[in-house]
Amino acid sequence: LQRYAADFARRYQSIPKYQVYNTALLSYFQGRGFKTEQLDPSRWGRWVESAIGAHLVNYTQEQDFDLYYWRDHNDEVDFVIRQTGNRLMALEVKSGHRQDNSGLHVFADKFHPEHSLVIGGDAFPTELFLSTPIERFLSL
């Protein structure tokens, strides 16, 4: 994924974020099972973020939106959806109870997305996000 920036040229000045298209392949090549991944909060967090990212990347093939990430120093947003007309939606993925969403607030101040959503943890359930057609979120 490319880094989101309002200026087109700046999007391609940053190092892209690696995103798998299929988390089954990620799990297979890491040689760990689902239950083993869940036992390590750090690894589980990366796995959940990868699952959400794969879900979104696969939808970019069907829907009219572009997918990015955003980072500015220590502030980060896991996924930024840009729809037609530069409508933005910011998504932050949480796999545990740690709810530091400061990156969402900084991003909102800079870019004014129409919507922001925290997925997982004590927020919007991960399973519900993955089982809901992405069009529902894009039409909010």
What is the predicted function of each stretch?
Residues R87-H97:
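Active-site ExK catalytic segment of metal-dependent nucleases
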Residues Q19, Y68, M89-L91, H115-I119:
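Hydrophobic/aromatic beta-strand patches that form the interior of the parallel beta-sheet core
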Residues S95-L138:
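Catalytic cores of nucleic-acid endonucleases
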Residues L1-Q83:
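Accessory nucleic acid-recognition modules appended to NTPase machines
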